[in-house]
């Protein structure tokens, strides 16, 4: 605080000014002392009522204030509704009831009335009469135009009628009452069309004999950060990591393991995989072909192991066994050589059997071989005239002509590459009888050694 004082100037002198500084007094606010809480057992009725009112006030719905107090509705506990069963009395019972109300009922008539109405006139002797909120049903049969249907919820109406027939919640109904568990249908994932069945291969392990060590990671619900594999659609076989979810459209945003691209896939075609499987298979480009080849080699190995060795003691049986085993070995080796040998030729009509090529668009279709440059470089033409390149021979199989007289080509043996006309077909023995076009010789061959042809230029075979 600054104070300014001035003195009257004397004649012929300058005025004097002086300043004084005073320290402001600070008023410190003292914190109140901590209140000491003493726990006292409240056993009086007044204290209990006060506590109950406080608890009710906490649950009270605030509507408005009046005179500084809260005015609102207290939610009363709802009781189960009961609709008493309407009983129609005949004229004899009605006469006894009227006498009972008038007070002129004799002891004999009172006994009759007790036999007719074991629960009393108004059901006052019924055990369940005091439980639940009763809805009185009038005996009159007047119009129900002014019926108040809001008196009871529609979902509670049927249960209220059953309670009026002495039914208790949880009891079974019928001659042999038993409790039946409520079966709730599974919620269909959004985006799944009507009639479609969702695929759920999650958690199904093909190798059921694996140890618990291999099952260290349990597959849970797909969430952000989970590893998934696409099992259907154009991105079939793609592995990725979930970066986001769109529950409204039941879709996932994933980042692919190969290429690191971000794509949106439906959750219906995605299954969760373990981190071990993701590290092992996510970088494999041709996983499906690798699995097929692995299964084929495993089948051949088991087939060879199942053949018992010859253990006969006699020399003749040894010779016979050795000859038969050698013939089997020669047959198997010849079949392997024939299957491994190039049999595909131009103008052959073959069937496409690979399911993964172009999402199965050519699967089980008949195609024509246009050019053959190698067992992994075959050019084909489909029924629409589209040409496909770099087709493997293992993706094709031979086709047998349907009608007698159609042309075919021998694709195995010493007559490989020769045209013939089919004369007969034996489906039981899987053989065809054909006449060679060049020499008119009649030959017999197995189904797998011949194939139908679709020749564009006849002069190439003259």
UniProtKB/Swiss-Prot annotation:
Domain G-patch: 154-202
Pfam families per UniProt: G-patch_2, GPKOW_C
Keyword Repeat included in the entry's annotation: yes
Subcellular locations according to the entry: Nucleus
Keywords carried by this UniProt record: Nucleus, Repeat
Positions with biased composition (Low complexity): 306-317
Chief place of localization: nucleus
Region (Disordered): 1-26, 182-218, 289-337
Domain of life according to the entry: Eukaryota
CDD domains documented for this protein: KOW_GPKOW_B
Comp. bias intervals (Basic and acidic residues): 289-305, 318-337
One Gene Ontology biological process: mRNA splicing, via spliceosome
Family label: Belongs to the MOS2 family.
Protein name: G-patch domain and KOW motifs-containing protein homolog 1
Organism: Caenorhabditis elegans
Gene that encodes it: gkow-1
């Amino acid at each position: 605080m600054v104070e300014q004082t001035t003195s009257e100037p004397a004649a012929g002198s300058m005025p004097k000014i002086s300043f004084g500084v005073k320290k402001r007094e600070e008023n410190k606010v003292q914190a109140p002392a901590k209140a000491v809480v003493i726990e006292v057992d409240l056993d009086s009725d007044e204290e209990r009522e006060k506590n109950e009112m406080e608890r009710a006030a906490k649950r009270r719905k605030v509507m408005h204030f009046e005179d500084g107090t809260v005015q609102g509705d207290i939610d009363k506990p709802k009781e189960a509704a009961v609709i008493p069963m309407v009983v129609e009395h005949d004229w004899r019972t009605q006469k006894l009831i009227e006498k009972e109300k008038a007070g002129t009922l004799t002891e004999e008539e009172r006994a009759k009335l007790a036999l007719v109405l074991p629960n009393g006139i108004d059901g006052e002797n019924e055990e369940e009469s005091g439980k639940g909120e009763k809805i009185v049903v009038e005996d009159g049969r007047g119009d129900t135009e002014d019926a108040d249907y809001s008196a009871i919820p529609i979902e509670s109406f049927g249960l209220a009628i059953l309670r009026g027939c002495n039914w208790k919640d949880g009891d079974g109904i019928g001659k042999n009452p038993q409790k039946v568990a409520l079966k709730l249908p599974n919620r269909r994932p959004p985006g799944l069309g009507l009639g479609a069945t969702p695929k759920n291969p999650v958690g199904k392990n093909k190798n059921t004999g694996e140890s618990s060590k291999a099952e260290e990671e349990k597959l849970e619900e797909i969430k952000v950060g989970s590893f998934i594999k696409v099992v259907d659609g154009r991105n079939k076989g793609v592995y990725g990591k979930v970066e986001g979810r769109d529950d409204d459209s039941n879709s996932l945003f994933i980042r692919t393991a190969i290429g690191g691209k971000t794509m949106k896939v439906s959750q219906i075609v995605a299954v969760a995989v373990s981190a071990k499987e993701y590290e092992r298979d996510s970088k494999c480009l041709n996983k499906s072909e690798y699995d097929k080849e692995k299964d084929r080699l495993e089948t051949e190995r088991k087939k060879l192991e199942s053949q018992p060795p010859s253990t006969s003691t006699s020399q003749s049986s040894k010779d016979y066994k050795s000859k038969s085993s050698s013939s089997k070995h020669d047959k198997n080796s010849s079949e392997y050589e024939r299957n491994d040998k190039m049999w595909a030729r131009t103008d052959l009509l073959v069937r496409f059997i690979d399911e993964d090529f172009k999402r199965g668009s050519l699967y089980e279709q008949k195609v024509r071989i246009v050019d053959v440059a190698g067992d992994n470089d075959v050019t084909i033409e489909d029924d629409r005239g589209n040409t496909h390149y770099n087709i493997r021979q293992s993706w094709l199989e031979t086709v047998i002509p349907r009608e007698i007289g159609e042309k075919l080509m021998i694709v195995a043996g010493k007559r490989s590459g020769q045209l013939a006309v089919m004369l007969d077909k034996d489906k039981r023995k899987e053989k065809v009888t054909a006449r060679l076009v060049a020499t008119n010789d009649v030959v017999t061959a197995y189904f797998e050694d011949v194939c139908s042809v679709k020749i564009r230029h006849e002069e190439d075979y003259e």
